[in-house]
Amino acid sequence: MTIWVDADACPKVIREVLCRAAQRTGVELVFVANQLLTVPKAPNIRALQVPKGFDVADNEIARRIQPTDLLITGDIPLASEALAKGAQALNWRGDAFSKETIAAQLTMRDFMDTLRASGVQTEGPPPLSQADRQAFARQLDIWLARR
């Protein structure tokens, strides 16, 4: 069982929550990014640096993830790939991606991409709030307790 983190865009506060949980439980935690990341010195926590390029980190995670694993990402297509392989996925706010809702989420993402490509200004997500951080930590603890 491994927690894979799409780390290029992962907020620092979420990385910190993940590291504390991994240190507490001993679960394997892997941050995948195309930049150098500093992680705590622990045998179960590591950073995997991949070459720069479009979706290189995502492709590496998709190649390695297993059905017993958890993915932490804000990337809906990557979450979809993880779910297809039987893994579970959470976003930074603690919302679980599910097989029942991923198709609708992909459709909405594609629609918003189309709007942006046509010049329509769309709002990005709001900054993470304290409630978001707590929701993420709560959902992570629930996942860890099931293991």
Swiss-Prot record:
Classification via Pfam families: DUF188
Top-level division of the source organism's lineage: Bacteria
Record organism: Chromobacterium violaceum (strain ATCC 12472 / DSM 30191 / JCM 1249 / CCUG 213 / NBRC 12614 / NCIMB 9131 / NCTC 9757 / MK)
InterPro entries assigned to the protein according to its UniProt record, in alphabetical order: UPF0178
Name assigned to this protein: UPF0178 protein CV_1768
Family: Belongs to the UPF0178 family.
